[in-house]
């Protein structure tokens, strides 16, 4: 993995501004940074959600994210990227995921960020359990996430 690629899976929260500064520090070749931050919603389908618990397959999750990061780095002219995904119990309003992509121009940064998030939502080995007043339930994959990820497949 190139030195300008950061992939972390962690329980602790992250600071978006600090992560962006780390990606761009000392880099005069960056003209655009696109960020996506996913935040835990407090409701789903009209039901109040107290928290999410995210689990992952250690080692495999990092390797799969790294593989897609390498694809993004080779597919678009990026100068760097960061993917940070939290695991453990996350309450409403807290950060879940951060994707940062840096490039000389915005188009590549936008496309790569969207590609990475589509992959994370559809295929990354994470499992999500919702907690509500009604109890807990595992969240199933959504077909629209699969469709979004499929559009990036080269034929």
Please place each PLM-identified region on the residue numbering.
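N-terminal, polar/charged subdomain of small-to-medium soluble alpha/beta proteins
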Residues: 1-96, 110-114, 118-155
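Short glycine-rich or small-residue beta-strand-to-loop segments that form or flank ligand, phosphate
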Residues: 96-103
